[in-house]
A protein has these predicted regions:
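Glycine-rich phosphate/diphosphate-binding loop of Rossmann-like nucleotide-binding domains
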Residues: 10, 14-33
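C-terminal binding/interaction regions
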Residues: 13-15, 19-20, 98-159
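A short beta-strand-loop structural module common to alpha/beta enzyme folds
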Residues: 37-48
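Helix-adjacent hinge/juxtasegments
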Residues: 54, 58-94
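Solvent-exposed alpha-helices and their adjacent loops that cap or buttress functional pockets
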Residues: 7, 63-66, 85, 105-107, ...
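Short, Lys/Arg-enriched N-terminal segments with co-localized hydrophobic residues
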Residues: 1-9
Length: 159
């Protein structure tokens, strides 16, 4: 696969809850082996914790520009992505397959991907990460649609 969107100088944030410590650690090592700088916003213990805290942390890190992109992992990917999506400017998408990850970047300009440590295995997770990092936002008609999504956020965020 061509590295259409990959920028190895990119700083990537990663967050997780207790259910995803092992997967997070493997993804961190994988990203480092590819030459990325990785910032850990997740827990490093198996003690039960609350995924919304970590979704907010990764959302804020991406929205502020502290990191360029984020990866969020909990049991299913759903809860942590919901929390991240509450942060202005975040477009977090749960991905359980590489195709969805690629389309999330190419068509939706997803700045955070999420997946479930209890849903997919580590090799699938690595493939998802690769597809997402290699993809590039296509712009054009997709940019207009992303703008529409962001307009929804602006209209409804302060209800």
């Amino acid at each position: 696969m061509k590295n259409k969107g990959r920028n190895k100088d990119m700083k990537i944030g990663i967050a997780n809850d207790h259910s995803a410590v092992d997967m997070k650690n493997e993804i961190v090592e994988y990203l480092k082996s590819l030459g990325y700088e990785v910032v850990n916003y997740g827990t490093d213990t198996y003690e039960s914790c609350n995924y919304p805290e970590y979704g907010e942390k990764i959302g804020n890190a991406v929205a502020s520009g502290e990191v360029e992109l984020g990866i969020a992992i909990c049991g299913t990917g759903a809860g942590i992505s919901l929390a991240a999506n509450k942060v202005n400017g975040i477009r977090a998408v749960v991905c359980s397959d590489p195709y969805t990850a690629r389309m999330a970047k190419e068509h939706n300009d997803a700045n955070i991907i999420a997946f479930g440590a209890r849903v997919i295995g580590i090799e699938t997770a690595k493939c998802i990460v690769d597809e997402w990092l290699n993809a590039k936002f296509e712009g054009g008609r997709h940019a207009a649609r992303v703008d529409m999504i962001m307009d929804v956020e602006k209209r409804n965020h302060n209800l």
